[in-house]
């Protein structure tokens, strides 16, 4: 998928014990739900079809592990619900980029991922996206 100025870039966090990138690959697509933090919900409302997302495992792993694309949403989680969800599909696994690597990188060290560690839907600039891709060796894990 080619980048253009309309594409948004995000990082979504998830505990791998709850739902891992391997689970997403197995399922083929999923509804990204369970986001209740008000700032994360505000960010999720800005996500659009075609936006690119890095999948970040929280907990013990603390690393970017894969890439996703938005294929649906945002829409209400259920009738009358004020929370929104989006639908995502896997693009591919990445060679892990750890939180330690991100904190040590000059371009990424002031990113909301580092500054707001409990935020589960984190916006990214194109430069940040490209830097994480570089740190992963722009390689896909096989």
Language model features with spans:
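Aromatic- and Lys/Arg-enriched surface recognition patch
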Residues: 65-126
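Hydrophobic beta-strand signal
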Residues: 54-55, 69
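Short, charged beta-turn/beta-strand-edge "cap" motif at the junction between a beta-strand
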Residues: 56-62
């Amino acid at each position: 998928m080619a980048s253009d100025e309309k594409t948004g870039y995000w990082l979504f966090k998830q505990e791998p014990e709850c739902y891992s990138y391997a689970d997403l690959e197995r399922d083929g697509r999923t509804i990204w739900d369970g986001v209740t933090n008000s700032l994360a919900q505000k960010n999720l409302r800005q996500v659009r079809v075609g936006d690119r997302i890095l999948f970040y495992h929280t907990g013990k792993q603390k690393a970017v592990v894969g890439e996703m694309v938005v294929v649906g949403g945002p829409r209400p989680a259920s009738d009358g619900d004020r929370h929104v969800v989006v639908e995502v599909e896997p693009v591919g696994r990445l060679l892990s980029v750890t939180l330690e690597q991100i904190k040590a990188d000059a371009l990424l060290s002031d990113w909301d991922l580092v500054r707001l560690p409990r935020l589960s839907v984190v916006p990214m600039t194109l430069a940040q996206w490209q830097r994480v891709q570089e740190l992963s060796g722009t390689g896909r894990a096989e």
